Amino acid sequence: MINLLSQKNYIIILYLFEKMKKLEDLILTYKDFPKKGIDFKDVLGIIQEPEVFKELILKMSNSKIIENCEAIISIDARGFIFGSAISLQASKPMVVARKPGKLPGDLIKQNYSLEYGESSLSLQKSILSKYDSFAVVDDLLATGGTANCVSNLLKNNGKEVLGLLTVVELTKLEGRS
């Protein structure tokens, strides 16, 4: 397993593990999706292989970031898959960062840029107030826009971000810079 840490962006990536080849084979690439020029990495093949998925979740759940956080925050939508499994394995509460129009109640919102456009994420204030330190979980790190959006939302509200855990990093997009 390779752990990469960037203090500047508070990002850790659990990217590879002992069954690297098997994991890579399960991540499919779709050219020109969701728009021309984008190579979309589909990580959903991982959850179709229970033993690989289980090993990945065990590895991610045993990180110091997860051990030391009060809660896990998962990013809409594929981050929910990995975040909820890690949350269950580590016995940590999970909070969700959702796209516009998906959460009820009093929200805090942050806009961000991604590889193929603009978007925003929201958190429920009432849930956020329960925890002080977070591990952020998503499926993939591309430009870093989504991860930085969540990090900024948390930090701007007095919360500590211990790190980010992802399954895949698209290094050519320099999301950690």
Indicate where each model-derived feature is located.
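PRPP-associated nucleotide enzymes
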Residues: 1-177
